[in-house]
């Protein structure tokens, strides 16, 4: 089989992708047998192409699954860990903007009773 285009794979359904994956795996098994038995050199070079094709099919399958999950969890309150945005550990533990902006009663009173003085300059 020749190399496949990923944009063609994206148009296929899940069952078609699974079938194509089975075909590629079967072909890879045949090529490996040919390698052991001393097959033609063109078959040996084809192993790399088939392995890449398998990887492409698996990638498209996983991308489709992930996009379907994103759609399913679109308006939910909690998201699975693998769908949350990837951030550093420190950023994930940081206070939210709302939490950081909260003030104590004492701070509020101090600001209310002693506001920042405004000065006007005479010209």
Curated annotation (Swiss-Prot):
Keyword terms of this UniProt record: Ribonucleoprotein, Ribosomal protein
GO molecular function, one term: structural constituent of ribosome
InterPro entries hit by this protein: Ribosomal_uL29, Ribosomal_uL29_CS, Ribosomal_uL29_euk, Ribosomal_uL29_sf
Gene Ontology BP annotations: maturation of LSU-rRNA from tricistronic rRNA transcript (SSU-rRNA, 5.8S rRNA, LSU-rRNA); translation
Listed SUPFAM superfamilies: Ribosomal protein L29 (L29p)
Pfam families cross-referenced by the UniProt entry: Ribosomal_L29
Keyword Nucleus: no
Highest taxon, organism lineage: Eukaryota
Signal peptide interval: none
UniProt GO cellular component terms: cytosolic large ribosomal subunit
PANTHER family per the UniProt record, alphabetical: 60S RIBOSOMAL PROTEIN L35, LARGE RIBOSOMAL SUBUNIT PROTEIN UL29W-RELATED
Family under the similarity heading: Belongs to the universal ribosomal protein uL29 family.
Protein name stated in the entry: Large ribosomal subunit protein uL29w
Lineage: Eukaryota, Viridiplantae, Streptophyta, Embryophyta, Tracheophyta
Protein's gene: RPL35D
